[in-house]
């Protein structure tokens, strides 16, 4: 299948079903809020390294987590019950995203400064969100221990990346995030590519064609955009 070069003058994407065998749909374009939102609504996401052109992907199969189907491992339930972690939403979005890139810097990261600024704009518009986990240090001050960020459109949440500085910190943030999604009626969390980590939490692979159908129903849900800073965590 051909890979399309995106035109600069409009934000439309070719159909995700036209991706090549690796899942690549298109190259080029920019990271404007309008283009990013159009991509997510089409089941497409950006993923590239510094120095490369912008690359846009739609993988087949697609890994998806239904929020009510979240599986929390027994050992993690114990860590949550101990209550050491404090959970917040959208308090330090920029810091969470930067840390997600920093922990992967040695092996190469797609979270470039350009990407950070693009998603910060989405965050300021109420579409991109973070969930943070904090641990108290020896001076009784809470320090950022882990977090996760992604994009929300209607009843779909697109998980982008997570990081941790302390054991279980990102996992607790994930459980808190998915709990919030379930409470608010979100239909799906797009995990993009298959990992054993997310499979353990109840995510399942689905054909891209099925994912795209489910996605259109999810983004049509009347869940408004907006910051989550006042959300009370369920854990």
UniProtKB/Swiss-Prot annotation:
Its main location: cytoplasm. Pfam families: Leu_Phe_trans. InterPro entries: Acyl_CoA_acyltransferase, Leu/Phe-tRNA_Trfase, Leu/Phe-tRNA_Trfase_C, Leu/Phe-tRNA_Trfase_N. Its EC number is 2.3.2.6. Transmembrane segments: none annotated. It comes from the Bacteria. Keywords: Acyltransferase, Cytoplasm, Transferase. It is an enzyme of class 2 (transferase). GO terms for molecular function: leucyl-tRNA--protein transferase activity. The keyword Cell membrane does not apply. One of its GO terms (biological process) is protein catabolic process. One of its GO terms (cellular component) is cytoplasm. It catalyses: N-terminal L-lysyl-[protein] + L-leucyl-tRNA(Leu) = N-terminal L-leucyl-L-lysyl-[protein] + tRNA(Leu) + H(+); N-terminal L-arginyl-[protein] + L-leucyl-tRNA(Leu) = N-terminal L-leucyl-L-arginyl-[protein] + tRNA(Leu) + H(+); L-phenylalanyl-tRNA(Phe) + an N-terminal L-alpha-aminoacyl-[protein] = an N-terminal L-phenylalanyl-L-alpha-aminoacyl-[protein] + tRNA(Phe). It is found in: Cytoplasm. Functions in the N-end rule pathway of protein degradation where it conjugates Leu, Phe and, less efficiently, Met from aminoacyl-tRNAs to the N-termini of proteins containing an N-terminal arginine or lysine. HAMAP family: Leu_Phe_trans. Belongs to the L/F-transferase family. This is Leucyl/phenylalanyl-tRNA--protein transferase. It comes from Magnetococcus marinus (strain ATCC BAA-1437 / JCM 17883 / MC-1). The lineage of its organism: Bacteria, Pseudomonadati, Pseudomonadota, Alphaproteobacteria, Magnetococcales. The gene is aat.
